[in-house]
Swiss-Prot record:
It is an enzyme of class 1 (oxidoreductase). Pfam families: DAO. One of its GO terms (biological process) is D-alanine catabolic process. It catalyses: a D-alpha-amino acid + A + H2O = a 2-oxocarboxylate + AH2 + NH4(+). The lineage of its organism: Bacteria, Pseudomonadati, Pseudomonadota, Betaproteobacteria, Neisseriales. This is D-amino acid dehydrogenase. Its cofactor is FAD. Oxidative deamination of D-amino acids. GO terms for molecular function: D-amino-acid dehydrogenase activity. Keywords: FAD, Flavoprotein, Oxidoreductase. It comes from the Bacteria.
């Protein structure tokens, strides 16, 4: 089977890898000059199944209103001039209830736990190195109210069989020794010892090299001008005057997936949620984190790579705007400087932004479409790195007719059809004869 994958981020490359392992002839099309140069380039570095939860949660509407008036708020909304932004926010708010949260979190954790296992399997099989660590995640709680508010999350972790440790400030310092100097600022912590970390860009680049060894072709610097169809099947992908044909097609273009498939009559509810990161050179290893922490107050993650600290966070709804907002840098600098003041040269840090493809319910969209030979792998939000291997393997199984190793219930576009979403009629774009 010949498959064309649109998108060379961590999801596209992971999908290509598993398809190639299944015996498919795979071509990856990417507009940048290499893999993982957009959203997969500078993320927070966390592989955190236990923290796989939708942003659409009970209490978020009220918190969102409060955050609007805070300087270092984790969420910001800037009107992008589109009706779609308002519609997407409305759908997200509709998921901010206990019932929807439980269903969505269950789906996300199922996929995330599986994906972590697949990454471990991949590491054992190939020896892939990407500055990975298996030291767990430590969620830092700065107030007693946050400690008490962990009860619901702990109940979910227990129900899902996720290992965890509840810590006091001294316990936090034992897990992350550099926090000893600032433990007076903490009320407690929640550790998930089975979480992992790593450089997503490095992982994707090296996995792409392994994929090439299995015959995957990568074409960089190409722009997909359109997807041709006959109303029932995809007949080719148009790149300038060239029409590329395959037996199956996968769209894994992150936040840009929606525009690519909209002309086909597929309206996927994915919105670009802007995130930021700093990459700080380490100057004092003893003053840096050993694994990764998540500051619950500011929703900022601080992760240790070999000689760097990655500080990532924020959620800004402002469309496809990729401008670097200096106020977001101030927030990231403030958080890492508050917790790890002696770990690295913060002023020498590089500043980055990327667009996470988010669905209103938090669950990604993985699976087929109304076209028999077109599949989607997008909408992972802040968890693309956490869910990449599992998502790639699940979709490869679906495409090749193998039985997925986990339940795929609720992962495809079908869940929106069940909610009464309307889909527009596809525009039929027949292939040019002789192309």
């Amino acid at each position: 089977m010949k498959v064309i994958v649109l998108g060379g981020g961590v999801l596209g490359v992971s999908t290509a890898w598993y398809l190639a392992k299944a015996g498919c002839q795979v071509t990856v099309l990417e507009r940048q000059d290499g893999v993982a140069l957009e959203t997969s380039f500078g993320n927070a570095g966390q592989i955190s199944p236990g923290y796989s939860a939708p942003w659409a949660a009970p209490g978020i509407p009220l918190k969102g209103l409060k955050w609007m008036f805070q300087r270092h708020a984790p969420l910001a909304i800037t009107p992008d001039g589109s009706l779609y932004q308002l519609q997407w926010i409305a759908k997200m708010l509709a998921n901010c209830n206990e019932k929807a949260y439980a269903v969505n979190k269950g789906r996300m954790m199922r996929l995330a736990e599986y994906s972590r296992d697949k990454i471990k399997e991949l590491r054992a099989e190939t020896g892939l190195q990407y500055e990975g660590r298996q030291g767990g995640t430590l969620q830092l709680l700065r107030s007693q109210a946050q400690v008490e508010g962990m009860a619901k999350d702990i109940a979910v972790l227990r129900e899902c069989g996720v290992d965890f440790n509840v810590l006091d400030p001294d316990g936090c310092a034992r897990v992350e020794p550099a926090l000893a100097a600032v433990k007076h600022k903490l009320a407690g912590g929640l550790q998930l010892p089975n979480d992992e970390t790593g450089d997503c860009n490095l992982f994707t680049s090296r996995l792409a090299e392994l994929a090439r060894d299995k015959g995957v072709e990568f074409r960089f610097g190409v722009t997909v001008d359109g997807i041709e169809n006959d109303g029932k099947r995809i007949t080719g992908v148009r790149i300038g005057d060239e029409l590329l044909r395959a037996d199956h097609y996968v769209v894994a273009m992150g936040s840009y997936s929606r525009d690519m498939v909209k002309e086909l009559g597929i309206d996927i509810p994915v919105y670009p949620v802007k995130g930021y990161s700093l990459t700080v050179p380490i100057t004092n290893p003893d003053g840096a984190p050993t694994s990764t922490i998540l500051d619950e107050t500011y929703k900022v993650a601080i992760t240790r790579f070999d000689n760097r600290i990655r500080v990532g966070g924020m959620a800004e709804l402002s469309g496809y705007n990729l401008e670097l907002n200096p106020r977001r840098r101030e927030t990231l600098e403030m958080v890492v400087g508050d917790l790890y003041p002696n770990g690295g040269d913060i002023k020498a840090a590089s500043f980055w932004t990327g667009l996470r493809p988010m669905t209103p319910d938090g669950t990604p969209i993985i699976g087929g479409t109304r076209f028999a030979n077109l599949s989607l792998n997008t909408g992972h939000g802040t968890l693309g790195w956490t869910m990449c291997a599992g998502s790639g393997k699940v979709l490869a199984d679906i495409i090749t007719g193998a039985k997925p190793e986990i339940s795929v219930d609720g992962l495809s576009m079908q869940r929106y059809a069940k909610q009464g979403e309307t889909l527009v009629v596809p525009v039929i774009r027949p292939a040019v004869q002789g192309a």
